[in-house]
């Protein structure tokens, strides 16, 4: 990682192109830890992390030479980079002999998912979010069986997850723990607080209170029927919620997230976020993923601004077509659209930063709101970092390395 990061507009535009167009990837020599197409690549100098979706019909090319990568446009060299640093502790073993990697399903550089469920009822009933791939390759019969996994088995897996987090944090990792699992089976919807406690208890036992207090621990759950239930989540050790809207307009919400919409209308999700602001606080305490590219820019920006005005911190993922998802054939927006939208979102972050719990440039806490953070499918955060850099702030590390 660079000793001093400098982000340029060219870096941002190249990342936008990679997220929009993908690239033809040639692995001349595999990285030391092996080549994984979902592992981020990093632009040297700016340390912007980006997903590089493999696409055969694009001008962009990436040459992988061990841990070094080179980016080209029809043979013209654009930039140099590297594979995102691998965590050595992920290749270790748990106390029961199982690989650490097996316990941290879906982890990326600064997020560890803590599963309280291994199946989404929307997938099991044909109502998945149309872009979602988490359970897309899970047979419905298997999903329905996993949806009723005994609590004793969930607890056993939770202990493995907690041990993996202990190994990670002992190695210096700091980031976001995401309590995740989609929509639980109808028979368990009154037991969500119990499931949260089931996975949080081993974390409290294995990880010191001092370290847990440093981490961003968020509930990527569906809103509860009674908003007061969030107080129970907080008592279990969560310090944030993440009620992901995905889109901001009711019509798009119904069309793209049929299961979410059938469970609760968009208005209820908005009310849940506002209740979270009161319980967990604004900014880092109340976040939401929104996908750039699923609705017109003006509609998205209006919705994002309204949420920020209420203290909600939107994390703007760039929509990516993923095999298995219903919307797989829909491409992302072009790079210029992404750059323009990201710049406007960054301006909104700055405009509404007094509604969050900490000034943007002073937020060095692990988590979604950390100043200078570069996440591999988020461009608006990079644009915000660029604007803060232009205001004279020195950028910290883009992501954890340990």
UniProtKB/Swiss-Prot annotation:
Signal peptide: none annotated. Disruption phenotype: Cells lacking this gene are unable to produce bacteriochlorophyll e (BChl e), accumulate bacteriochlorophyll c (BChl c) and are green in color instead of the characteristic brownish color. The mutant also has a novel homolog containing a triple 8-methylated neopentyl substituent at the 8-position. The keyword Iron-sulfur applies. [4Fe-4S] cluster binds at residues 120, 129, 132. It is an enzyme of class 1 (oxidoreductase). Pathway: Porphyrin-containing compound metabolism; bacteriochlorophyll biosynthesis. The lineage of its organism: Bacteria, Pseudomonadati, Chlorobiota, Chlorobiia, Chlorobiales. Keywords: 4Fe-4S, Bacteriochlorophyll biosynthesis, Chlorophyll biosynthesis, Iron, Iron-sulfur, Metal-binding, Oxidoreductase, Photosynthesis, S-adenosyl-L-methionine. Residues 104-359 form the Radical SAM core domain. PROSITE patterns: RADICAL_SAM. Its cofactor is [4Fe-4S] cluster. This is Bacteriochlorophyllide c C-7(1)-hydroxylase. Gene3D superfamilies: Aldolase class I. It comes from Chlorobaculum limnaeum. SMART domains: Elp3. Its EC number is 1.17.98.2. InterPro entries: Aldolase_TIM, Elp3/MiaA/NifB-like_rSAM, rSAM. One of its GO terms (molecular function) is oxidoreductase activity. GO terms for biological process: bacteriochlorophyll biosynthetic process; photosynthesis. Involved in the biosynthesis of bacteriochlorophyll e (BChl e). Also able to catalyze the same reaction for bacteriochlorophyllide d (BChlide d) to give rise to bacteriochlorophyllide f (BChlide f). It catalyses: a bacteriochlorophyllide c + 2 S-adenosyl-L-methionine + H2O = a bacteriochlorophyllide e + 2 5'-deoxyadenosine + 2 L-methionine + 2 H(+); a bacteriochlorophyllide d + 2 S-adenosyl-L-methionine + H2O = a bacteriochlorophyllide f + 2 5'-deoxyadenosine + 2 L-methionine + 2 H(+). Binds 1 [4Fe-4S] cluster. Belongs to the radical SAM superfamily.
